[in-house]
Amino acid sequence: MCSSDLKLLTEPINCKRDIPGFYLNTTQQALDIISDVGNDNLFVQYDIYHMQIMEGDLAPTIEKNLAMIPHMQLADTPGRHEPGTGEINFTFLFDHIDKLGYKGWIGCEYKPLTTTEAGLGWIKKYLQ
């Protein structure tokens, strides 16, 4: 894998609501494992939902570790629904990520409050 362009991602998950006892719960724990392994192909899959529950401070954490985050996942908290249904200020967060020049992927991993189509309505303002 060292000579490959493949990236292997590790994802911290919250142990407070979704998976009690999960072994990897913070961004720093993931970074420590990556450092211990010492392979340039290892990165963090940063799940905004899980890290809001475990750490808060999403914007500074993303900024500090941007080079190690090639993929983010999103859902609002609480409830794990689409952006705009909970406590995360996604307008601010997306603007911040954009200003940082993020070139990675952002995936949606949430349970729509109603239908899938309605659950994608939040994205319209970002596609203009």
Predicted regions and their residues:
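Histidine-acidic metal/acid-base catalytic patches
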Residues: 24-46, 50-128
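Conserved beta-strand edge residues that scaffold enzyme active sites
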Residues: 14-15, 111
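Short beta-strand segments at enzyme active-site cores
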Residues: 7-12
